């Protein structure tokens, strides 16, 4: 998910290099998230991340540069990747509810180390919009090849 704050060009370069070196079709988590958002016609987003405020702000800027509006964002403030997996289901659920209050077109859980896939599936009806989990999106991206 690093392309979400480094910029999408990073993933595009990576994919291009991998395909040139291996001749194997290649995808990425963030590009798959964007594909799903486009397929949904979602432009107003709720963004859930485990990151620090500066990283969350960069994600917001990058998505706004792509024409999305970040209607609401919630971040846990962590800076160690291994800690992201220890964020409780209750905390993730509360973050989802917080951003859902802004009535976005879709919610993105942006970090493959956050255990959000089951909650995303379970909470879509509760919050009234699609929830895209980055780990689940990764599996979808690779299933396309």
Walk through the language-model features, giving the residues of each.
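Non-catalytic structural scaffold of enzyme domains
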Residues: 1-145
């Amino acid at each position: 998910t690093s392309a979400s704050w480094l910029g999408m060009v990073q993933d595009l370069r990576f994919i291009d290099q991998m395909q040139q070196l291996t001749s194997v079709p290649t995808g990425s988590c963030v590009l798959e998230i964007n594909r799903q958002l486009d397929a949904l016609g979602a432009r107003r987003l709720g963004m859930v991340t485990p990151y620090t405020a500066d990283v969350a702000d960069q994600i917001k800027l990058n998505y706004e540069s792509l024409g999305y509006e970040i209607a609401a964002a919630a971040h846990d403030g962590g800076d160690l990747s291994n800690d992201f997996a220890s964020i409780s289901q209750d905390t993730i659920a509360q973050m989802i509810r917080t951003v859902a209050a802004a009535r976005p077109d879709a919610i993105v859980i942006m970090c493959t180390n956050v255990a959000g896939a089951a909650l995303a599936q379970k909470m879509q009806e509760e919050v009234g919009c699609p929830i895209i989990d980055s780990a689940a999106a990764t599996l979808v991206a690779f299933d396309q090849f």
